[in-house]
Amino acid sequence: MFTQAAAIDFQIINALFTRVISACDILGIDGDFAKELEETLAELPPIKISERYGTIQEWIKDYEETEPGHRHISQLFGLFPGDQINETDSAIYEAAKKTIARRIENGGGSTGWSRAWTVCFYARLKDGYNAGEHLGYLLKNCTANNLFDIHPPFQIDGNFGGVAGITEMLLQSHLGTPQNRIVELLPALPEKWSSCSVKGIKARGNFTFDFSWRNGKVTKLSVTSAEDNTLLLKLNEKTTDIQTDKEYTVEENILKMSFVAGETAEMNF
């Protein structure tokens, strides 16, 4: 099918333009060019919800789907790896849930890389159960004995995507502003992973995290910043009763803690 204005095209353009605008602001350069990009962004078609299916439209027009279980789910680029689709817009977020559910119900995710992408989608949707189930399917049915992802031929997309999905299940840092990303721990934790630990996981802002959890709640956390920066950590039922020697403030359930390059903070919960 050929059409103007495929959803993925404008989601990629949105991701590119917003990052270039942010870079111009941080570096203090090319202000006129950044303004031109902002004006162009305002003219792009918005993400649309299909009146037929309640899903994210793949095209500018609300076409009838000819292959609802297709392995490609391009209209959700803005959910992952992009960040345009997120919980700040509940209607679009719910439509994204319906989009992936409809694909899977009709046989989607049949290849290794597509199944890995599905893991990433469910992680961003904060659905630990489905993220874990599709990760299990990826490892059991789409992975060779040597751990190569299979399409059936080897495709490294599935290996990289699977690791990305696991990372997103344990830590996310895509929300907030480009210079002030909000870190959330255990956003999509399966019940089977109720007590465990992870080391060396990176977050936007050049932070490195080591943390442990028990019964789905963080118990110990070590954060190292590679540069002068401020950590914004989302607090919820998984991160309560903070104990640390380092100063911090909390506003609207966001912990704010300043770091100098190379500094490490230890926290217990």
Model region roles, listed by residue range:
Residues 6-175, 182, 196, 219:
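Active-site core of glycosidic bond-cleaving carbohydrate-active enzymes
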